Amino acid sequence: MSSKIMEYTKDLSIVISLYNEEESLSELVNWIEQVMIREGYNYEVLMVDDGSTDGSWSLVKKLSEKNSAIRGISFRRNYGKSAALYHGFAAAEGRVVVTMDADLQDSPDEIPEMYRMVVEEGWDIVSGWKKKRFDNKFTKNIPSKLYNATARWITGIKLHDMNCGLKAYRNDVVKNIEVYGEMHRYIPYLAKNAGFGRITEKAVQHQKRKYGVSKFGLERFVNGFLDLISLWFLSRFGKKPMHFFGFTGILMFLTGAVLTMWVIIEKLIQQAQGLLFRPVTDQPLFYLALVAVILGFQLFLAGFICEMVSRNSSERNNYKIREEF
């Protein structure tokens, strides 16, 4: 997303990614509306339907007829939360952009204080921290603590709950980052890499799930760790892959060359001393050296190819939208 100066037509944009949340939508919208009226905000609610197969999208359209602040985007199929946030961020017109989940586990009552922290205290991002959780201890709470500890160590961002869906951003933060793949978990890290380093957190009330079942499982946490490693690598070497592949390749190549020279010199010394010696091709060290040289050359070539790809990649998200209003 490109940076551009814009006039904010709203105080708040609330971006909600939803997938098969028909049961909770009416209650959530009513709750948000009560808070917005009480605080006197000029607001909009951007509901992004990520390919729901229930009646979620039809309900969003009905709710928008009663409340003109509701806007909707519907994908043709399920692309994931990152895709929903990407389009929600692009459409957001509010001075402050708030993200929250549609399952009623995030409380709209937290929004006013988070808004104040962004506007009055000047934070780029205020991230929610579910200090007291109502999730299964073994399948979600413990993996979550392990995941967040690792995320803090790798990213250097001291957040207790990196993956909390309830967050508040300055508008120019979301306009200057690209959320893709499964990187919605690491928006604070994306923002930090884009130059938005004023990041803090606020303890928020976590609600018990009222309808349906959680769509998060142990597999999502494993994927989260893999995504974190990918993001760390891309943030360090994404624009300069030759620095990683080239350096590693040269190191391997030189190691192989040194081992090869050692085998040859050893043979020459034994010859000069009239000692019996095995043919070079009978020595395991020779093949180890050969493998190192070949791997080094291939890694260097991979770095060159990645460098060319990174220089010519458009890095655009391309998702098919069925309907938008």
Named regions from a protein language model:
Residues 23-27, 54-58, 83, 161:
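Residue-level preference for short helical/loop micro-motifs built around acidic side chains
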Residues 29, 33, 41-52, 73-74:
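Short beta-strand/loop segment that forms part of the nucleotide-sugar
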Residues 2-9, 188-325:
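Hydrophobic helical membrane-anchoring modules
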Residues 62, 69-77, 81-91, 96, ...:
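Acceptor/aglycone-binding surface of glycosyltransferases and processive sugar-polymer synthases
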Residues 21-24, 52, 81, 107, ...:
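Donor nucleotide-sugar binding loop of glycosyltransferases
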Residues 49-58, 104-105:
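A conserved acidic beta->alpha catalytic loop
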Residues 1-34, 41:
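N-proximal low-complexity "stem/linker" segments adjacent to membrane-targeting elements
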